[in-house]
Amino acid sequence: MEIAFDLSTIFTDNIQRLTRTDLLKYGPKRYWAVAQSIDCLGEMSSKFHGWKRVITMYDKIVDHDEEQTTYIMWEKVNGSKSILKGLLRVGYKTLYLTDNEQNQYMEKAMCILDFFVVPTEQRSGNGFKMFDEMLKAENVTVDQCAFDKPSAALQQFLEKYYDRKDLVWQSNKYALCSNFFIGRHPTVPFTPRQTKRASRASSAVSSHASSRNTSPIGRNRPRHDSVADLMRQDMLAGVRAEVDPNSPTGLKNARDFGHRRIW
């Protein structure tokens, strides 16, 4: 993509690193080409990825609460013109993440927010040059990066140049290399849970054992005597103590039972 401005009057590198401070210094009133380069590349990136809105714009970057860094790949041509080849926007974000073992993390990661190479400049190694320059400048590795909604093209790029095949997808639409979690300690380690069926079975067994051993109903229930106990009681009832006829009890018995013993 060609722009009618000699970027060599502003930029010092063919892969120019621009912080928010740099972008504020190169304001659109005096350096309109900087804002226009970012806006044009951002619009092309959104169309290429099929996004509904443009996510990379000069105004959004300088007004954003979080610090972001933009890389522009360009080349000077004859006269006062330049060719724009690609754009890469990155920034640190605090993310809630989960690994393949369901351990949970809260990590501040370098996020790849927008990565685009102009179609006519693709298949020439420009994407790798720009991405590798970013890794060196930010002092990170590809395994330390989190990718925001990585496209199929970006996944192929990671596999081709960095041998990263299986990304770990997150509920927030970010994706990471599996090596991202090596050496990191989970905020919430995964704890296996019982299935509902196993939980119900365990509860039923516990309830049955408790009712047999500790139920108040079982403790207060009337005792049922055995047949042997009843026979023993009858035998004991047949044995009566001898009473002196002249004692009060003997006199009472004589009066009540016609002056004769009935047993």
Curated annotation (Swiss-Prot):
Q: Which GO terms describe its molecular function?
A: L-lysine N-acetyltransferase activity, acting on acetyl phosphate as donor; tubulin N-acetyltransferase activity
Q: Where is this region: Disordered?
A: 191-223, 242-263
Name any Gene Ontology BP term: thigmotaxis
Q: Which reaction does it catalyse?
A: L-lysyl-[alpha-tubulin] + acetyl-CoA = N(6)-acetyl-L-lysyl-[alpha-tubulin] + CoA + H(+)
UniProt-listed Enzyme Commission number(s): 2.3.1.108
InterPro entries in the cross-refs: Atat, GNAT_ATAT
PANTHER family documented for this protein:
ALPHA-TUBULIN N-ACETYLTRANSFERASE 1 (PTHR12327), ALPHA-TUBULIN N-ACETYLTRANSFERASE 2 (PTHR12327:SF1)
User: What family name appears in the similarity comment?
Assistant: Belongs to the acetyltransferase ATAT1 family.
This chain's protein is named: Alpha-tubulin N-acetyltransferase 2
Query: Which species is this record about?
Result: Caenorhabditis elegans
